[in-house]
């Protein structure tokens, strides 16, 4: 018997009783073998050979061998069955004689044991299948699993018992939870804290995680975009309704001290050329929010740190110089470290103040958690009450530190000389932003001003002592009533853009969870609230009075008390359940929470001439711990929630730079560009070469990044190359243009109507063409050009000329006037200069370039026809023949770049062939080459098919159209109905292009995406 048969036989015999021995066959020519129950021995007879065969044997049983006829009752016998070659008896071809007599008691006892074993085997279930699963496949039905009557009648009773047993087991299983479930239930806060070690969660994280694609950025876990299709819906919300965003990840730096000392310390970090500073009158009084760009001390216009917004706390006694002032500076988390260090150096704050923050105990390790969850003396299935530590219990801090700060490091610094105190208030407040015309209606419906406590009310047991003390002062009550009246007026104003930009309103409100509606509703403006036209007109013209900007949110002690004494959702729900009339208003009286908030108006789009005020709204500042208490009421009033993607779209439609990607002269912007290029390169390499564009053949040198430094350097060297010859040709300064056609060293673009083979040959080797051009320029200029280059390098070294972005409002207004087309009948073919503005002359251009030799200009581009720009799209200068074709046919889309040759393809193919040869070699020969043969292979691994390898050539002259700049944001604009883009161009190249273009077509450029050869016309504009 084989092993498989032995295992099968053992499986069949496992339920047999131990006192029963069943014979499995007889061995021939053996001795006496007793049958169970019999006492007479019997002998196995030898088989006689069957006549006619030599291998077959037949067993013969003699019926006359039984002497007693009473023994005809056979207790056991062997059946005859047919095998190959004849009939055989038993498994081994043997037979046994029937015993002469048996003992009835012994025989019955053996049979009873067999019957009991058989019944036991029948009643005990050996498989895990249910009754309906034992049926043949053709009899099974899907409804049998939940409908017993679908089974055959003989099996319905058994199936009913199985169903009842399953329900009973399910109820018992719910009590016996696994260790993981019990640990998660007991230590959920600790688990959340552990998951926030690297990336901090906002208070609305759980809500976002269920509905948004989450990303880990800047030390936080933030919602990037909704999981549903909502691009157009979010735009409609920003335009006609309301969009809600959580900006609590923004950082806040607080400066305390004398006003004179603070302004003196911060004056070197900003410049009045870029706009308002910290000393602006409306901002200094605390009436408006200001915005500016910070630089390193006395480094303007270079070494920019980033854009910030700021708020001054209003003075109690205006004009008192001895009063201590508070200043809040809000900034993006990527800018925090650089700006904080520079402010500390400017204010001379070097001494850290001892931190008063309660630092939580270290998070338990998995082994410690396991030891905590062990239950040695308790039954697992029982419900257990948590043991209370009583007075020794330590509260678990839900949020430790913030995403940009180590909780163990100090967060306050003081200056011994100036007395200024700098505090890091990041994650100490929540900041929500409502965008859209319905922001007023949603605010006035979701938030109600706090009720004033009267003398007769029982206020002894209330935890809000600060509000009780406030209500005892008539001046404070009067101020609160004025703030409430102004807040109610907002409900009737149709758009936040009607209010002065940056208006601030302080307010103390009640718990918004009490006014929560039964179901979601859409908030609409209420014109009845604007019946007092005089007050509304005064509010729209002058804004909120200075005294109404006061808010208790500036007091950290009050904010801490408000956070600690917040009524939990569980207690509120319990109070609602105890109401006599379900669904009625819950009135808490003096025990209701009072929350100080600050409302800040966001002006939206403030540059340009079209869609002014689009995207305006309100920012709401709240104490920490109250995020979800305000978030849910806003949701119930019909807002749509957006993430980081919606923030980028909002800034794109406002045509304002987005932080940090649109600040190339900022350290955070440079880091962002490096990370973005790395991610795009990895994504590009994941695709096979046949399924990705070959950027070398498309003439795209940098498809994943924007080489700003090389762009500005190339344009600076181009101007310096023909500046001296142009001056020599016109010593009296009669020439007023920087036309490229008049410069001998300036390259002329190739004509698009030339045969394709000639054009392809002309740019087949771009490096050779550049070398020939440079050699020609050197021959024409001679030693004078070299001297000029050395002088310019000395000038750059002396002035510290680095890459910068032009942010002077005066110069931007001048450039904006020059970019637009002008009529032909104006004097000299130029646009008539405005008041205080110069014309587009050579002297004006040189004076600008003298101060900003390597500068970029923020521009907006609008396509004339079809096309949708994308990031890293190239902005190029059109040629003369492009204008001619556009003048003949206004439907002309633009020229097309001819394909370039790929000089790296042969190197990559040789590299692959070399690798194949090395694989085919024997292992001994391959290893004998040693590390000397691996060095060139390692150097060649940097080559990627489709990308330019090594240092980039001159980016401005690589293609048939001169490169001017790059696009950083671009897409189809639903506001305009065509493609729009935002980006930077070289200031030198822009002036050169404007001075050489016809007056009627000034400001036209060409856009070409990285993966396309088609140029498309667009109009450039500078909005100030």
From Swiss-Prot:
Basic and acidic residues: bias regions: 387-399
Localization: Nucleus, Nucleolus
MF annotations from Gene Ontology: ribonuclease P activity; ribonuclease P RNA binding; RNA binding
Pfam families in the cross-refs: POP1_C, POP1_N, POPLD
Keywords: Disease variant, Dwarfism, Nucleus, Phosphoprotein, RNA-binding, tRNA processing
Composition bias, Basic residues: 1-14, 911-923
Protein's UniProt name: Ribonucleases P/MRP protein subunit POP1
Source organism of this protein record: Homo sapiens
Lineage summary: Eukaryota, Metazoa, Chordata, Craniata, Vertebrata
Gene coding for it: POP1
